[in-house]
Amino acid sequence: EKEEYIAKNKQVIAEHVIPAYSEMISGLTKLLGCGRNDWGLCNYEDGKSYYEALVAYNTGTDFTVDELFQQIADARQEDVDICTTILASNPKLASMDIKLDSQLTDENAMIDHLKKAITKDFPKACDTTSEITHVDESLSEYLAPAFYITAPIDDYSTNRIYINNANNYTDLYYFTTLAHEGYPGHLYQTCLSYSYGYEPVRCLLSYPGYVEGWATYVEMMAYDYAGL
């Protein structure tokens, strides 16, 4: 049944999806230069209300836009105050060259290290494999620095993370990024949720604030896992 499904998907992509994208590219190319709105959503009727709805959907809260802006401003100010206090007590920190352990310069080694390191804070990860793939150069300009491809609900034994080499990021950046996308971030959260009896209907729904909130939170913990 799975093989039939895979074959059908390939057929649909070849006969419908790719031709549809080709037609869309052609149509959008013809429209280049005819746009009359340089102000985004706010310049459309009910644009403000639509934006507010998007904010609520993507954050998962009922805070107003102004309240969210204030929360962000308060958090940033708190971070600045903390950094100022730390630098005042140790000015040399500003010029320190922070580097990862030489054994953690390989992406697969980073994933293996993170998978073990998180056990002091979180339940043991599922028995899964992680494949790290590099974004094709033709797409590097348009894609995020990294992203996790959500595993199928019926088979989360193999997972894939894409890394974009468009920018010359440091090893520490890649380490924290792999924590965000891998362990204990998106990959870990997805597989553990599945193993605990994730309700299938949730695979049809989107919780961007909850999912990205978790990954961003644990990304900050990665500095500790890196031994810094």
Residue ranges of model-derived segments:
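N-terminal maturation segment of proteins
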Residues: 1-228
